[in-house]
Curated annotation (Swiss-Prot):
The protein's assembly and partners: May form a heterooligomeric complex that consists of seven subunits: mnhA2, mnhB2, mnhC2, mnhD2, mnhE2, mnhF2 and mnhG2.
Membrane-protein topology: Multi-pass membrane protein
GO cellular component: plasma membrane
GO-annotated molecular function: antiporter activity
Protein name: Putative antiporter subunit mnhA2
One GO BP annotation of this record: monoatomic ion transport
Transmembrane segments: 1-21, 33-53, 78-98, 118-138, 167-187, 207-227, 241-261, 273-293, 300-320, 331-351, 387-407, 424-444, 472-492, 527-547, 595-615, 627-647, 651-671, 676-696, 712-732, 768-788
Family, similarity comment: Belongs to the CPA3 antiporters (TC 2.A.63) subunit A family.
Location in or out of the cell: Cell membrane
Length: 800
């Protein structure tokens, strides 16, 4: 099955989900229909693993807008396969989990699963795209679907604000990324990613190389919640927990990391890129791990935990980016080791963090709270979730015998080896190691503290008063499966390493086969070395801080109020006030003012073109034959048009406007175009009658005083537009080098079966244009229908 067929199959499933919204009895099955999408995708990608290991990559290219080099280019190599497996396999767990989490009585299930499947489709599009513009389209689709999912409970103010904040930040990054893609096209002349990476040596010497890197970093940092763009992720926790488990821990937040990994052969040629990504990642890791201890909400803790872990992966991506400069050097193995560690931890993080979010969701769903000040002694009520969250949290902390320990050891090992790399000095290495170790200590602290406070403190029935708590097996099943994978990967890491991570490394290197001998062998025991010593320090200090310190009392008062998000909110409010004032000044609910603005902008554009290229000399002027009737009709039209400027009665103005239309009908008759005349007569009659009838529905607004300044502006704009139209007619007649297309229509109209040339143009030559004009009318009608029925739907929702 082709990659295109897979994406089409997902779209078909989305259509089936949409059909279930028509009947409430069918809506409860929407989740199981949606579940087929990740199942089909998982089976497909698992079947491709043997081929990708043998370096037999799938690629598809379908022409789209070939003149702009925008095609549907898809490619499945090792890197895209690894991310596709994460998206689809984690998707199975999340989709099934959502069927148990959401209620068919309270929630609009078809809408939720449609958005969730759209997000999965968009993420697969990002990782499979081999065309920059196609990648951008899917990139923004993830922002749109994320917005829809975060605002799913739209009656909740936090959901609305969180959705808008995440949308604004990620779309800003997406637009910056688009600018970067355009710069790449200017430098290379292609939008194909494989071809772009093949020109890396040429691009690095271009003047746009550094600006392009900055645009890429803005796109990656906003999407992957790097400091200071991290603020949208905690707010996004207002979404349903399945959304948090899927988008905001395992998939969407990894899109920025994927972008940098995909373009590592190009971006890694700049030392500036390596420094920025490394230190921004470490700052994010440190900031996230400390801020997580300020949170009382379990999802808030996991949100900042995700920010911290993403920073950790980002730092390794930055350090490993130097491989692009040193592929043939002796130190190339260090860069490969760091990139391997980044990919390994990316996979591990998706597993244990998704399990943690699911555990928190079950606690919230069954216990009715996520507040660690209320939850205590939950191991008695939730024994399965106690096991799941304890193992997943300890894996995140880097405790032995769990998969997180292996990737955390590799991370510490990578930091200690930075001193051997040309990009980093000894002082830089010391700073990097200190930042990584301190962040890891706080990571261990909040992981252990979270589990201790929720499960291992004394149960207090006075604080937690909810009764009849139960822990359904089907609800717990996805998190239990993910929990089992945590120790399994620890004991057999190289099965995943050779089958998934090594092919992904080839993708990161741009298909360089020389990377294979440099790939590290993952072992559980490395002997007594510096990373092990650092791990012992992290565990000891982290345990003391988690057990001996009551972090609920540490971050209180003014310390707790310090927040980067509040700075964003202040800027947002000021920006909103500023734009509201300007908006009210421009948007005054006067249609003629909007028309003046639109025409004014058009005139400025045309005028600028005239200034730049100048007006051509009029050396020929073709004027159609005309008689006395045409002259009389033209004079009548001008007189009526001028009179409209001075008349103030609405009814008279409408009638005179209709008269102009009837005069145009006479023009068509004089020019021997009866079909056009009949069409014009019918349309003009209907619109004039409707216009007059609509007066009965319009409010009796007092007549406004004549504003001479406004009238002068109207007349000036009208005269200028008339001059521009006439000048464009003259310019069109001077085009000697181009043959008129009119002759083609005259020769080919017989083939259409039409009775006249106008019908042939509308029905055949520009049929697609006519079709889309009809589509615009349909969309407008649907919008009006939605507005008219808004109150009815709102009342029905309130009754339900």
């Amino acid at each position: 099955m082709s990659l295109v067929y897979l994406l089409i199959a997902i779209l078909v499933i989305m259509a089936m989900i949409l059909l279930t919204s028509k009947r409430r009895a069918m809506a409860k099955y929407a989740g199981y229909i949606a579940l087929t999408a990740p199942v089909i995708a998982s089976i497909y990608f698992l079947l491709q693993v043997p081929s990708v290991i043998k370096q037999h990559y799938l690629s598809v290219s379908i022409p789209w807008m070939t003149s702009l080099d925008i095609n549907v280019d898809l490619r499945l190599d090792g890197l895209s396969l690894m991310f596709s497996l994460i998206i689809s396999l984690i998707g199975i767990a999340v989709f099934f989990y959502a069927t148990q989490y959401l209620s068919s009585r309270k929630d609009n299930l078809p809408r939720f699963y449609l958005y969730l499947t759209l997000f999965m489709f968009s993420m697969l599009g990002i990782v499979l795209a081999d065309n920059t513009i196609l990648m951008y389209v899917f990139w923004e689709l993830t922002s749109v679907s994320s917005f829809l999912l975060i605002s799913y409970w739209y009656n909740n103010g936090d959901s609305q604000f969180g959705a808008m904040q995440s949308f604004m930040i990620t779309v800003f990054g997406g637009l910056a990324l688009l600018v970067g893609f355009i710069m790449l096209y200017i430098m290379t002349g292609t939008n194909n990613i494989t071809e772009i990476l093949g020109q890396a040596d040429h691009i690095k010497n271009h003047a746009l190389f550094i600006p392009m890197i900055i645009m890429f970093l803005l796109g990656a940092f906003t999407k992957s919640a790097q400091f200071p763009f991290h603020i949208w992720l905690p707010r996004a926790m207002a979404a349903p927990t399945p959304v948090s488990a899927y988008l905001h821990s395992a998939t969407m937040v990894k899109a920025g990391i994927f972008l940098l990994l995909r373009f590592t052969p190009l971006l890694g040629l700049s030392n500036m890129y390596i420094y920025i990504v490394t230190f921004v990642g470490l700052i994010t890791m440190l900031f996230g791990s400390i801020t997580a201890l300020k949170q009382w909400d379990l999802k808030g803790i996991l949100a900042y935990s995700t920010i911290s872990q993403l920073g950790m992966i980002m730092a390794m991506v930055g350090i490993g980016g130097g491989y692009a400069q040193h592929q043939q050097d002796a130190i190339a193995s260090i860069y490969v080791f760091v990139l391997f560690a980044a990919l390994f931890h990316l996979m591990n993080h998706a597993i244990f963090k998704c399990a943690l979010f699911m555990g928190v969701g079950i606690l919230d769903h069954e216990a009715g709270s996520r507040d660690i000040r209320i939850l205590s002694g939950m191991r008695q009520l939730f024994p399965k979730m106690n096991l799941v969250m304890m193992i997943a949290a300890l894996s995140m902390a880097g405790v032995p015998f769990l998969n997180g320990f292996l990737s955390k050891e590799m991370f510490l090992d990578a930091l200690t080896q930075t001193g051997q790399l040309s990009q980093f000095s000894l002082i830089s290495m010391i700073i990097i190691v200190c930042m990584g170790v301190i962040a890891s200590i706080f990571t261990f602290t909040y992981a252990l503290y979270m589990v201790k406070e929720v499960f291992w403190t004394k149960y207090d029935s006075k604080v937690f008063t909810k009764k009849n708590i139960h822990e359904p097996w089907l609800f717990s099943l996805p998190s239990l499966i993910l929990m089992v994978l945590v120790p399994v990967i620890f004991f057999v890491p190289n099965i995943f390493g050779k089958g998934i991570i090594v092919p992904a490394l080839r993708g990161v290197s741009g298909g360089n086969h020389q990377i294979d001998p440099l790939v590290p062998h993952v072992s559980q025991w490395h002997g007594f070395n510096i990373p092990l010593l650092l791990t012992i320090i992290i565990i000891l200090l982290g345990s003391v801080l988690a057990i001996k310190v009551d972090w609920k009392k540490v971050f209180t008062g003014k310390i707790r109020q310090i927040s980067v998000s509040k700075g964003y909110e202040m800027v947002y409010r000021q920006f909103e006030k500023f734009t509201t004032k300007r908006f009210k000044r421009v948007m005054q609910d006067r249609l003629n003012q909007y028309i003046i603005m639109t025409l004014g902008i058009f005139m400025v554009i045309i005028g600028y073109g005239y200034i730049r290229i100048g007006l051509p000399k009029v050396h020929q002027l073709h004027v159609s034959e005309f008689g006395p009737l045409e002259v009389i009709l033209a004079i009548v039209t001008v007189i009526i048009g001028l009179s409209l400027i001075f008349i103030r009665q609405r009814l008279t103005m409408v009638i005179l406007n209709g008269v102009i239309g009837f005069v145009v009908t006479l023009f068509f008759i004089a020019m021997k175009a009866p079909d056009l005349a009949l069409t014009q007569l019918v349309v003009e009659t209907i619109t004039t009658i409707l216009f007059i009838v609509s007066f009965s529905r319009l409010p009796n607004v007092p007549r406004s005083k004549v504003n001479k300044k406004r009238e002068i502006i109207k007349i000036s704009v009208s005269l200028m537009m008339a001059l521009i139209v006439v000048s464009l007619i003259f310019i069109a007649q001077q085009a000697d080098g181009l043959a008129s297309i009119s002759n083609f229509y005259l020769r080919a109209d017989k083939l259409t079966g039409g009775k006249n040339i106008v019908n042939a143009i509308l029905g055949d030559f520009r049929a697609l244009d006519t079709l889309f004009e009809g589509l615009v009318l349909i969309i407008t009608g649907l919008g009006i229908y939605t507005l008219l029925n808004y109150q009815d739907r709102r009342g029905q929702d309130e009754r339900e």
